Amino acid sequence: MAIRQLPEILINQIAAGEVVERPASVVKELVENALDAGATRVDIELEEGGVRLIRIRDNGGGITPDELPLAVSRHATSKIASLDDLETVATLGFRGEALPSIASVSRFTLTSRRHDAEHGSALEIDGGRLGEVVPRAHAPGTTVEVRELFFNVPARRKFLRAERTELGHIEEWLRSLALARPDVELRVSHNGKPSRRYKPGDLYSDARLGETLGDDFARQALRVDHSGAGLRLHGWVAQPHYSRASTDQQYLYVNGRSVRERSVAHAVKMAYGDVLFHGRQPAYVLFLELDPARVDVNVHPAKHEVRFREARLIHDFVYRTLQDALAHTRAGATPNSIGGDGTGYTAATSGGMGGIASGGVPGNGGASIGSGGAYSYASWTPSQTPLGLRVDEARAAYSALYAPPPSSAQQSAGMPNMAGTGLPATAQDSGVPPLGYAIAQLHGIYILAENAEGLIVVDMHAAHERIGYERLKHAHDSIGLHAQPLLVPMTLAVGEREADTAEREAETLATLGFEITRAGPQSLHVRSIPALLANAEPEALLRDVLSDLREHGQSRRIASARDELLSTMACHGAVRANRRLTVPEMNALLRDMEATERSGQCNHGRPTWARFTLSDIDRWFLRGR
C-alpha cells in the first residue's frame, strides 16, 4: 500500500480524538483560552449537555480580523515562540491544537473584537471547511460557538452519554476552575435557563470554597500554607472524619493548572494513612507553586498530566507538609483555626508523651500544648505535664487547679462539695479548655463533658487508644529501627529492575533495617531485616518496598507495618468499654487528648469525639421559637 499525505481535515479529526473527548473537553479548552486572554467574566451557554450547542463568551483581549484564520490553524498560538518558552510555559494553553481540532468535528463560529476596534469580525467553519472573515457587531472580547459536536464523526457521537451525564462532566470541570480562579465571574446556562453563577471574589477565598464544595467541606477544612526549597503548597485539606467514599473532592493544581499527578496523590494518601478510616478517601484542594522550568506540562495534548523534574523532592515536600498539618489537629480544636491567622498550620511545641498507667502502655516524659493558634486559650495554661490515668497522683493537682472553694451559700443549701470531684463551678468560666470538664459517663463507653460552647461526647476507648498509639510511636521514633541479622542470609529472586533499585537504594534500605547485597543480575542476598517485624513476611515486604522506591523514591511500608503492630498494642492496652471512670480520670483523659497529635481520630480513622453546641441543643427542644 502506497504512503500518502493525509488531508488537513482528517489530520485535525485525528488530533480531535486526543483533545476533544466529550463536550466537557470543548468547554475546558475554550474557557482556558478565554482566561489566557485576560477575561474576568465568562458566560457559558449549553444545550443538550453541550452536544447541540456550546457558546463561550468572554471579555478578554479579543482577536484582530486578520488573525482569525490563523487562530484556527494547527499549531498557531500567541503563547510560545521558542523551545525556551515551551520549557517555562505558564499559560493554560500553548499547543495551538484546540481550535482547529474542535472546528473539524463541529459547526464552528469564531467572533471577536479588540477593545480598540470599532466592530467585531466573524469566521465560520463547517466540519473543518473554512469560510470567509466577515464584519459582525460584537462587544469587546470573543465568542466561540460550537454546534452539533461530532456531527461528521458518528462513531464518536454514539459513544457520548446521556444529556445529564455530559452536563455533569461540564459542571465538575467548572467547579475545578472556580476553585482555582475565584477572581473570575462564571455564568452558566443550560437549555435557555440559568443553572449556575460563580461570583468573583478574593483569591483562594473561603467563600468560594463553600460555594463550590459546600459549607460542610468549608467548616471541616484546614488551611495549609507552607513554603520551602523553592516550592509552595497552599489550600485546604479536610479533617479525616470528613472523608469520602470516592475521590470526587480531590483537586490538585500545579501553577494554577488542574492536573492529575500520581506522586502527589500518593504523598497525600501517605499523609492521611494514619488517620483515615479503611477504604475512605481524603478531600482536599491543593495548589502547588514552583518554577515553571521545574515542571513539564507538555505530556499529553489534553494537558491533564504533568511531569516533575524533581519528583522525589516534591513528593517528600507534599507528604511532610500535610503530615505536619494533620498532626497538629488535636481534639477540641476548631478546623479553620489551624494556624490561627489563617496563613497555615503552626506546630505545637515538641516534647515527650506522658504515660498511661492503666493501659500498660509505656511513656517517656511529658508533653506541652502549643502556645499559639488554635491551642491557646484564655487563662488555662497549666505548667505541669499532661496527666495520665494515675488518679491517686493526679487528684490533688486537679483539685487545686480546677476546683474553686465552695461558697457558704452552697454549703448551707446542701449542694455537694465540688472540691473532691475535680470539676469547676461552671464550664462557662473563662479559661475553659477545649474539651471542657467531665460531668458524667454514659453506659461505660462515652464521657460527657461541658465546655464553653456546649456538650462534648468522647469515645473513651478510641481516645485512649490514639493516645497510647502516639506515645508508642514517639518512643520508637526516638530509638530508630533496629536491624536483626539473619543466621542464614536469604536469597531473593527478583526482576532486574528490582535488583537495580536495591543496589541504587542500598543506603535507604539500611535505614529501614534491611542489609542487602546484589548476588546476581536477578537475585539479592538479604542479611538483616527490621527487628520489630521479624515475624512478618520479609520477602513480600521487601518487594513492596522496592516497588515504592522505584516509583516514588521512598517507601513507608516499614513504617506502616510497624505502626500497624504498635496500633494493635495500643488497642489492647486501651481502657475498655464498661469500665467506670471517676471524674478526675475522665478529666485526665480529656487533657491528654488536647495534648496529643491526631487525637481527633482513633488508630482506625474513626472519630474520638463530637461537639454539640448549646444552639444545637436549643433547636432540639425548640427553644427561642
From Swiss-Prot:
State the GO CC annotations. mismatch repair complex
Is GTP-binding among this UniProt entry's keywords? no
What name does the UniProt record give this protein?
DNA mismatch repair protein MutL
MF GO annotations: ATP binding; ATP hydrolysis activity; ATP-dependent DNA damage sensor activity; mismatched DNA binding
Record has Kinase as a keyword: no
Q: What does this protein do?
A: This protein is involved in the repair of mismatches in DNA. It is required for dam-dependent methyl-directed DNA mismatch repair. May act as a 'molecular matchmaker', a protein that promotes the formation of a stable complex between two or more DNA-binding proteins in an ATP-dependent manner without itself being part of a final effector complex.
The record's annotation in SMART domains points to: DNA_mis_repair, MutL_C
Q: Which GO terms describe its biological process?
A: mismatch repair
- Pfam families given in the database record: DNA_mis_repair, HATPase_c_3, MutL_C
PANTHER family, alphabetized? DNA MISMATCH REPAIR PROTEIN MLH, PMS, MUTL, DNA MISMATCH REPAIR PROTEIN MLH1
Similarity comment: family membership: Belongs to the DNA mismatch repair MutL/HexB family.
Q: Which organism is it from?
A: Xanthomonas axonopodis pv. citri (strain 306)
Q: What keywords would UniProt list here?
A: DNA damage, DNA repair
